[in-house]
Curated annotation (Swiss-Prot):
Gene3D superfamilies: Fumarylacetoacetase-like, C-terminal domain (3.90.850.10)
Keyword set includes Cell cycle: no
PANTHER family: ACYLPYRUVASE (PTHR11820), ACYLPYRUVASE FAHD1, MITOCHONDRIAL (PTHR11820:SF7)
InterPro entries documented for this protein: Fumarylacetoacetase-like_C, Fumarylacetoacetase_C_sf
Alphabetically ordered keywords of this record: Metal-binding
Organism: Staphylococcus saprophyticus subsp. saprophyticus (strain ATCC 15305 / DSM 20229 / NCIMB 8711 / NCTC 7292 / S-41)
Similarity comment text for this entry: Belongs to the FAH family.
Protein name as annotated: Uncharacterized protein SSP1806
Residues annotated as binding a divalent metal cation: 146, 148, 177
Phylogenetic placement of the source organism: Bacteria, Bacillati, Bacillota, Bacilli, Bacillales
Highest rank taxon of the organism: Bacteria
Gene Ontology molecular function, alphabetical: acetylpyruvate hydrolase activity; metal ion binding
Alphabetized SUPFAM superfamilies for the sequence: FAH (SSF56529)
Length: 301
């Protein structure tokens, strides 16, 4: 399943993509009329939280089938052309990112590879697919992109052994880790350079892990104005998904809706000769196999 959150006619909701259509089932409406018992999550995050005791996907499947069989199925759909995409799930706790997890990316920026180079991104930096990111020209002329695979956590845990780590994954998404290279290079920490308003585009979907069985063998392609900048594969990650979860959960308790960014391959603007940073009006597309394409724009003004 591909889950998303959106705004439609001034109201926020969430849904699941309709197969072979550029549309979604509005799950707020579907559950309101066809939920089994009292199961009626108000947001996608609520659904992930309840998934620890109830099979969320199975409840979605049953409710959608009931909506289809009602003869009024179209009343429960929204067209993508009519909605504003929001971040698929707003974490209640953490947006955790691993840096220098691709050797070629570390090399292009002359960074030493460390086993753990971890930082957080402010939740206020989250934005959705097709949104416009402020150009931040008042503080930097070195705005950069980093296309990444994102892990979405599905159940709570800490000190998770590697052998059980994938049990804690609900699904995967796309992240563009927008970075102010000027601040990053001037400071000994990454939080400020990585937490700009609009600096964490996520989406357009969360793809459930059953639909992405080989997340460590998918291509990541980032384009700026249709020019290919990054063309990598998650197989190049130094620490794999189970290792990332094992390492971070030694120190941090993970909860449903937490997002973990797994690092970026080579091809960022700062690594080019000469560097090519994002400019007002630029379009950035990050595509990952079997998830989709995350598109964002840099504001003209």
């Amino acid at each position: 399943m591909k889950f998303l959150s959106f705004r439609h006619e001034g109201q926020t909701s969430y849904g699941v993509k309709v197969k072979r259509e550029e549309a979604a089932w509005d799950l707020k409406k579907v559950f309101a009329d066809f939920a089994e018992g009292s199961f009626h999550p108000k947001t996608l995050l609520n659904g992930l939280q309840q998934n620890q005791v109830v099979d969320f996907q199975e409840q979605v499947r049953k409710a959608v089938v009931a909506a289809e069989d009602s003869g009024k199925g179209e009343d429960y759909k929204v067209q993508f052309s009519d909605i504003e995409f929001l971040p698929p799930v707003t974490p209640t706790n953490n947006v955790i990112a691993f840096g220098r997890n691709y050797q070629d990316h570390a090399n292009e920026l002359n960074h030493e590879v460390q086993r753990l180079y971890v930082f957080t991104k402010a939740a206020s930096s989250l934005t959705g697919d097709n949104s416009t990111i402020p150009n931040h020209k008042d503080i930097t002329d070195q705005l950069d992109y980093e296309g990444e695979l994102g892990i979405v956590i599905g159940k709570s845990g800490e000190k998770i052994p590697k052998g059980l780590a994938l049990d804690y994954v609900y699904g995967y998404t796309i992240i563009n880790d927008i970075t102010d290279r000027k601040a990053q290079n001037a400071q000994d920490q990454a939080f400020l350079s990585k937490s700009l308003t609009g600096g964490c585009p996520v989406g357009p979907y969360i793809v459930t892990k059953d639909e992405l069985p080989t997340p460590e063998d998918v291509n990541i392609v980032t384009k700026v104005n249709n020019d290919i900048r990054q063309d990598g594969n998650t197989g190049q990650m130094i620490l794999k998904i189970d290792e990332l979860i094992e390492e971070i959960s030694k120190y941090v308790a993970l909860h449903p809706g937490d997002i973990i960014a797994t690092g970026t391959p080579a091809g960022v603007g700062a690594g080019m000769n000469p560097p090519q940073f994002l400019q007002p009006g630029d379009e950035i597309k990050v595509t990952i196999d079997n998830i989709g394409t995350l598109t964002n724009f840099i504001a003209d003004k």
